[in-house]
Amino acid sequence: MKFTRMLVLASTSLLATVATSQAQEVKRDTKKQGEVVLKPITIISHGKDNIEATGGTVLTYKDIEKLQPANVSELFSRQSSIAVSGGGGPSKRIHVLGMEQSNLAVSVDGVPQTATSWHHTGSNVIDPAFLKRVEVEAGAAAADSGFGAAAGAIRYETVNALDLLEPGKTFGARIIGSYGTNGRGFSGSTAAYGLKDGFDWLLMLHGTSGHNYKNGDGTEILGTEPAARNILGKAGYEFDGNRIDIGYERSRDKADRLIKMNMGLPGDTEYPLEVARDSVNIKYTRTDATDMWDPEVQFYYNRNDYWRNDYQNRTNGNMILKEDLYGGKLQNTFTIDYGKITAGIDFGKHDYNTDNYGHNDRRYRKFNTQQVGAFTQGRFEFDNGFSLSTGARYDYSRFADWNDEVFSDSGASVNGTLSYKFNEHIEVFAGASRTWLGYVLGDYGYVHARNNAFYTDPTFSPGRARNYKAGVNFGGADWSAGITLFDTRIAGLPNYDSQKLGNDPEEYRSRGFTLNARYIWNYTTIGATFTKAKVTAGDDPVLPNSGSFMPIGDMATLFIDQEIPDYNMKVGATLAWAGRISDEAATAANFYDQPAYTVVNAYAEWNPPAVKNMTLRVGVENLFNENYYERTSFAPSQNRGGIDAVWAPGRTFTFQTAFKF
């Protein structure tokens, strides 16, 4: 679609008469412990989108504290729309509605992240120990969510000193130590933070050391030992209405892993592997922002490395991947009578380097992509009960391949979400987007196994996506529920065949619906989610081969949290269920049916009255020792002499002690 037509569509949506809606937010009254007060939230509230009201997921700091996740599987264990495949930390892949997170605009503290480099590596980009908030905006994403938001956006936000300091204090520290059975081993997290004369700072360290775990049948799963060594550092300074934030994150995972971490091959062995990530960013904002001047300026640098050196087998071979991503964003938010408008530009350059296996006649390859974009997003609440979030962006994309061939193009994207509130208990909404993705390189790890003749098809073109969603939310004084229908289509993705890089001819699609419900009564919270999704490539179901699109079928979660204030205790449990998947396409490709499974996790937490700054916790994952592999894992098949899944851990107990000073 031409840019002028897209601009007309965006302008039309900005002028449309549309509806506002409400969801329910839980807010604890500090005057009476345990009393719950619910206040309405519209889809647009104070110029911000309410992600949950349109079928998305939000994990707050309190949610993360309840879960105390050791990995991203546990982080998203209560979300049926998000599936995480199993294995060691670097192998975990996150899929939203069956679409791997590389299809979403992923950021950490506002910094764009690199896509998954290889279909046998994981997609997690952040240590859960550092997190304070996660937003998963599934489907139509806002224009200021970033470039390439084909299927939505995932925003991870890490803690800072102001989040952890006790009221009235200028220095604090936190120490968390745990021991887990079934190979989990020891985990330790230490943080120090302070505030003085407008300067705040934080330093946090987290490390794990364990062994390979066993599945529910007692079989050792190779390459799964915990081996994280991570650092988070932050500093902020406020002066004369200005604020500058600087952040650094470093992650290392060095251990013996399977050659292809997400699948078990016949006679498979472990081999030394190191995965590393470094990220630096600096951001400028105003603490005394006005209606017309509320700027945000950010610059960043990311580096991702994958080292598998000197492997002797030519079929798999050496594999060294290096990525450098750097860029920035400049934007301003304008406040008007009915809401806010954010406008700005963003830009980035992504450098790729591959070291092919030793017998290849093209040992090294270097290539890069560049992007520059302009965007605007408006979020409005009207007095008549209507609300609207709509925006557009225009991007230029350039791709220079390993043969110095250059491809360039530009395109526009547009989005809109509207809602209407019938009364204080019912809301309806609908949203849509068309997104221009630029040149998508995706699973570029294939390049490491291509010879000197490998080239880019001269007709290689940018990708594109369409999203549609609609739903209804219900709410009362102590309960809420909702349903969201979704339909996402992505085309123009890359295809690395044996001779060239070209476009995949298939259109990939995920469609279905999600349900959610929550009930709150005094100290008790009960919640449930259900997701049904059909994921296809063209007219056929996608195969369970750990690709960018995976079948998830039917999935559900049920959870409960209970506070027991008389004993300073909290207890809770989560049940996750996945239905059986069987289809003719997978059978024809020699995959076995994927069995159903049900997994229960539980925890208990106690604050001893005599030591108020100490918390003791015991958790159990997979309480009933179910033998299963997580949905979106590489499914077992008869191919290559028999491929096995990387099975999930069996019953695992974790004992944790935390001190806060």
Swiss-Prot record:
GO CC annotation terms, alphabetical: cell outer membrane
Domain TBDR plug: 48-159
Main location: membrane
A Pfam family per the record: Plug
The keyword Transmembrane is assigned to this record: yes
Family: Belongs to the TonB-dependent receptor family.
Gene that encodes it: bhuA
GO molecular function, one term: siderophore uptake transmembrane transporter activity
Cystines in this chain: none
Keyword Iron in record: no
Its membrane topology: Multi-pass membrane protein
Descriptive protein name: Heme transporter BhuA
Function, as annotated: Heme transporter.
Leader peptide range in chain numbering: 1-23
UniProt-listed InterPro entries: Plug_dom, Plug_dom_sf, TonB-dep_rcpt-like, TonB-dep_rcpt_b-brl, TonB_rcpt_b-brl_sf
Subcellular location: Cell outer membrane
PROSITE patterns reported for this sequence: TONB_DEPENDENT_REC_3
Stretches assigned to the TBDR beta-barrel domain: 170-661
Induction: Induced in absence of iron.
Alphabetical keyword list: Cell outer membrane, Membrane, Receptor, Signal, TonB box, Transmembrane, Transmembrane beta strand, Transport
